């Protein structure tokens, strides 16, 4: 692939050269899901765990991830699946994502400190819809936690 420089910021790049004089380049940028704290600072990562950048402070607009086993673990994969399933307006409120196993993902909504108990990543799209409806019915400023781990029986405290 001459002419295309390697970059960790790109997930895919594929040049296509349909004849006779056209060149099409398709590029897919990596999308960060959050940052992981280490002795070097906060490393912004995508869902595959690819490091995109490191800064001394948490990057604004990206939650801090604490997944047991780090990138490549089942806990990290579950956090990534959950985060990507959230609608943009809820995603923007998430400041922390934790998981000690793939079955206990928990989110924190920064403006209020409200905890979202997610459980495992199964049915994440459905859980995201249930969470959005619960947040509309009872906004986070009046709730200490939402439990959508059993999405057919959401619990708000």
Report each predicted region and the residues it spans:
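Charged, solvent-exposed interaction patches on well-folded alpha/beta domains
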Residues: 2-157
């Amino acid at each position: 692939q001459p002419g295309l420089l390697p970059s960790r910021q790109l997930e895919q790049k594929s040049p296509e050269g349909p004849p006779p004089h056209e060149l099409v380049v398709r590029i897919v940028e990596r999308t960060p899901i959050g940052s992981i704290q280490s002795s070097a600072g906060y490393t912004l990562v995508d869902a595959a765990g690819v490091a995109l950048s490191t800064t001394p402070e948490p990057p604004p607009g990206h939650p801090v991830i604490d997944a047991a086993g780090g990138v490549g673990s089942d806990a990290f994969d579950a956090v990534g699946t959950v985060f990507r399933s959230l609608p943009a307006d809820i995603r923007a409120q998430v400041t922390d994502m934790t998981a000690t196993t793939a079955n206990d993902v928990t989110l924190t909504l920064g403006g209020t400190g409200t905890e979202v108990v997610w459980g495992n990543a199964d049915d994440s799209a459905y859980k995201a819809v249930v969470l959005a409806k619960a947040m509309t019915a009872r906004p986070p400023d009046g709730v200490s936690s939402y439990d959508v781990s059993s999405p057919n029986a959401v619990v708000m405290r």
